[in-house]
Amino acid sequence: MLIFFELGNSQLKAATILKGNYQFLGSVRHDAILSGEFIESFNLNEQNPTAVYVSSVAPSQLNAALTEVIQQHFKLYPTFLATQPSCCGIECGYEKFDQFGVDRWMAILGACSGSNKPTFIVDAGTALTVDAVIDKKHIGGFIVPGLGLMRDSLLKNTALSEQSLVLQSVQDGLLAKDTAGGVMGGTLYMLGSYLNSLLVDLELETGRKFDCIGTGGDFLSLKPVLDKPYNYVEDLTLRGMKEVIESL
């Protein structure tokens, strides 16, 4: 058995490969790492993997905590994957490839697996990232605040109270009639409009039509305001990790 962990800014996701069969195990919050509860949450108590692979954008303290639990439970040291200049036939667009986030790189590899079509990848997590691939080459991307960061910024830098966002918003039209709805709907439309406009401009600039793939904890909230159809893949980064290991 192989075990894969994706350690993001707020969650830990896991998957396994056993006898060639891939299985996504779900996600837990960071608290489960510090307590070691993620082993039980993912039903890994009785497993004896031959290798454990990690993709992480988390602080070093969390990486160390995850590593310690893995070592204690599985009696082996995890392999931390990193961005490469090229892998699985895909070329990284960053000249300094080591500065390109490993989460974005793995998402690209997962999204482009088995496809030669131009691909537009949106990861709506704590930060919202966008990347594009044409003819197996990553042509670049953007990073902007995610929905949560936008909403937190309004709370921290204005007179809005956190309580005002806890209240259930009731809307009978497009525009909000209370503070919660104003913040929730406004930030949603900001990101949705940004993605819609960016994709239009990108297709005009390149003369290509893109297949669109979305992932991340907030993507399903964004999907209703997006103009083009997106394929949602919850475990996209883990699937990219799988591609890396199978290419070795």
Swiss-Prot record:
Task: Summarize where K(+) binds, as residue positions.
Answer: D123
GO terms (molecular function) for this protein are:
ATP binding; metal ion binding; pantothenate kinase activity
Q: Which reaction does it catalyse?
A: (R)-pantothenate + ATP = (R)-4'-phosphopantothenate + ADP + H(+)
Cellular component terms, GO, for this chain's entry?
cytoplasm
In this chain, substrate is annotated as bound at Y94, G101, V102, D103, R104, T179
Under NCBIfam families, the record lists: baf
Can you say where in the cell this protein is located? Cytoplasm
Per the UniProt record, the source organism is Hydrogenovibrio crunogenus (strain DSM 25203 / XCL-2) (Thiomicrospira crunogena)
Main localisation, per the record? cytoplasm
The annotation note on the cofactor reads: A monovalent cation. Ammonium or potassium.
Q: How does it assemble?
A: Homodimer.
Q: Which GO terms describe its biological process?
A: coenzyme A biosynthetic process
User: What HAMAP family does the annotation carry?
Assistant: Pantothen_kinase_3
Q: Where does ATP bind?
A: E6, L7, G8, N9, S10, Q11, L12, K13, T126
Q: Which family does it belong to?
A: Belongs to the type III pantothenate kinase family.
- Xref: Gene3D superfamilies: 3.30.420.40
Q: Does the keyword ATP-binding apply?
A: yes
Q: State which gene encodes it.
A: coaX
Entry's EC annotation = 2.7.1.33
Q: In which pathway does it act?
A: Cofactor biosynthesis; coenzyme A biosynthesis; CoA from (R)-pantothenate: step 1/5
| Database matches in InterPro entries | ATPase_NBD, Type_III_PanK
**Which co-factors does it depend on?**
NH4(+); K(+)
Name of the protein in its database record: Type III pantothenate kinase
Signal sequence: where?
Answer: none
